[in-house]
Swiss-Prot record:
Residues 167-202, 216-234 have a biased composition (Low complexity). Residues 133-331 are periplasmic. This is Cytoskeleton protein RodZ. The chain crosses the membrane at residues 112-132.
Length: 331
């Protein structure tokens, strides 16, 4: 008898047994308690059997027990000592482990995201650097090619300038010929002046009229020899005053600049290096195609209007333009 009483007293000292005893006194079933508390029947059964569900936190379990106690009219002060013996042990073991695992999982996820972010950032920086290097290298190669072409053309221009004096010596021959032609004219005119002198000396001579005729005939061809010289000033004036073209292209240079200009026929109007302070006035058949090594060093006027080169100056690139009378300058 004493053993059975001791067992009943121990069972009554547990939280689950105390709640079951109070429920049975009120005549409630586990299903009714579960419906009123909005819990599962299995959860109510675990509470009465003093079992803690593995998927249920200790905080929620304490809340369910308190709600159950209020339902069966058991004071919380009576259940607190019993809950203190059961819940703290489980809370001390489970709660820290759960928070540690969550923190470890979150830290692992954050570390993976951070690694991926750094990888993407490095890839973007690498691609940007490679693109900039290729563009810079291409510009340097193009500028060096232009410089080589310019130096080659300058060397060719120097060779041609050395041959110019040989060509200018040719007009000296016509000058000598003209001097030779003028000599007979002078000699022919000499008898005309001497003829009047001989006439008074030989007044009675019959030959005097015939000599006068001969001298007159000698003076007659002398006039055509001098007449072709008169048109020369007129031809020289025509050469020095050429007619201005409506398609003039004017360029002023504020620094050394490599330049290449060609017209619609493909003829190169200019190709070479222009020095600081120089200017060019070109005319040809539109449209013009321009290639400028240093756009910031040149100012262009086409048909009296300035050409905008600001987009090439900002990017510091070689300017390639097509100038047309009907359209605005295009790259």
């Amino acid at each position: 008898m004493n053993t059975e009483a001791t067992q009943d007293h121990q069972e009554a000292n547990t939280t689950g047994a105390r709640l079951r005893h109070a429920r049975e006194q009120l005549g409630l079933s586990q299903q009714a308690v579960a419906e009123r508390l909005c819990l599962k029947v299995s959860t109510v059964r675990d509470i009465e059997d003093d079992k803690a569900p593995a998927d249920l936190a200790s905080t929620f379990l304490r809340g369910y027990i308190r709600s159950y106690a209020r339902l069966v009219h058991i004071p919380e002060d009576e259940l607190l000592p019993m809950m203190a013996k059961q819940a703290p042990i489980r809370a001390a073991k489970v709660a820290p482990m759960q928070s540690f695992s969550l923190g470890k999982r979150r830290k692992k996820r954050d570390g993976w995201l951070m690694s991926f972010t750094w990888l993407v950032l490095f890839v973007v920086i690498g691609l940007s650097g490679a693109w900039w290097w290729q563009d810079h290298k291409a510009q340097q190669e193009e500028i060096s090619t232009m410089a080589d072409q310019s130096s080659a053309e300058l060397n060719g221009g120097d060779a041609n300038s050395q041959n110019v004096p040989l060509d200018t010596s040719a007009p000296a021959a016509p000058t000598a010929d003209s001097a030779a032609n003028s000599a007979p004219t002078d000699t022919a005119s000499a008898p005309t002046t001497s003829a009047p002198a001989q006439t008074p000396a030989d007044n009675n001579a019959v030959v005097a009229p015939s000599q006068a005729n001969v001298d007159t005939a000698g003076t007659t061809p002398a006039a055509p020899a001098t007449t072709p010289a008169s048109p020369l000033p007129t031809d020289q004036a025509n050469v020095t005053t050429p007619a201005a073209s409506a398609q003039d292209l004017v360029m002023n240079f504020s620094a050394d600049c490599w330049l290449e200009v060609s017209d619609a026929t493909g003829k190169k109007l200019f190709s070479g290096l222009q020095r600081k302070g120089g200017n060019l006035n070109l005319s040809g058949q539109a449209p013009y195609k321009l290639k400028i090594g240093a756009p910031a060093a040149v100012q262009i006027q086409y048909l009296g209007k300035p050409v905008d080169l600001s987009r090439f100056i900002r990017t510091n690139q070689v300017a390639r333009l097509t100038l047309n009378a009907e359209s605005s300058p295009a790259q």
